Amino acid sequence: MNQSLLAPFGTAIERVEAGLEALRQGQGVLVVDDEDRENEGDLIFAAESLTNAQMAMLIRECSGIVCLCLPDEKVKALELPPMVENNSSQYGTAFTVSIEAKVGVTTGVSAADRVTTIKAAIADNAKPSDLARPGHVYPLRAQPGGVLTRRGHTEGTIDLMQLAGLKPAGVLCEVTNPDGTMARLPEIIAFGAAHNMPVLTIEDIVVYRKSLLANVG
């Protein structure tokens, strides 16, 4: 990761803190993973404060595969099985079956319908019977231990929500360029500047979490 491009956003700790504050304010953040991994940037919002306008941005500016990151215990509570029995994807992305709210949606495709589905899934009293399967929202199961266990956007999203003091559920989608190619760090930084969103990396979250552990120790 070319850290020099990120220097205007401060140190790793400062970048994470800016991201946490944005999430607390109901705004989006951009998270880039390692160059030797997916080398992609995801636009991430807190699920609990997600708006229809933010969902529309995810659909319009990103890949369109809008995912709901959930901790393992929530996936189990909703009885969401893995999308496939044997996950052979390159990075082991833990998709579950896709979902739709049973109440309050039409076809499930619109921004408003997808927000309704997400709010139904993350409700404190949500039950498996509240969700239809399949649907147009794609849950991702985060590994316990977060980015210290797996350096993925799914784990980074849950870590950020927990560090921000929010409900551990976040919505993400990969940022794409207008021509449909994947946005890399320079394009992600430009996107962040255009939309006044902080940019940080998975490595930043690792550094931040390790610093917290060191302070506790």
Curated annotation (Swiss-Prot):
Enzyme class: lyase
GO molecular function: 3,4-dihydroxy-2-butanone-4-phosphate synthase activity; magnesium ion binding; manganese ion binding
Source lineage: Bacteria, Pseudomonadati, Pseudomonadota, Gammaproteobacteria, Alteromonadales
Binding site for D-ribulose 5-phosphate: R37, E38, D42, R150, R151, G152, H153, T154, E174
Role, per record: Catalyzes the conversion of D-ribulose 5-phosphate to formate and 3,4-dihydroxy-2-butanone 4-phosphate.
One cellular component (GO) term of this entry: cytosol
Name by which UniProt lists this protein: 3,4-dihydroxy-2-butanone 4-phosphate synthase
Site positions (Essential for catalytic activity): H136, E174
Assigned keywords, A-Z: Lyase, Magnesium, Manganese, Metal-binding, Riboflavin biosynthesis
GO biological process: riboflavin biosynthetic process
EC number: 4.1.99.12
Source organism (scientific name): Shewanella sp. (strain MR-4)
Protein family: Belongs to the DHBP synthase family.
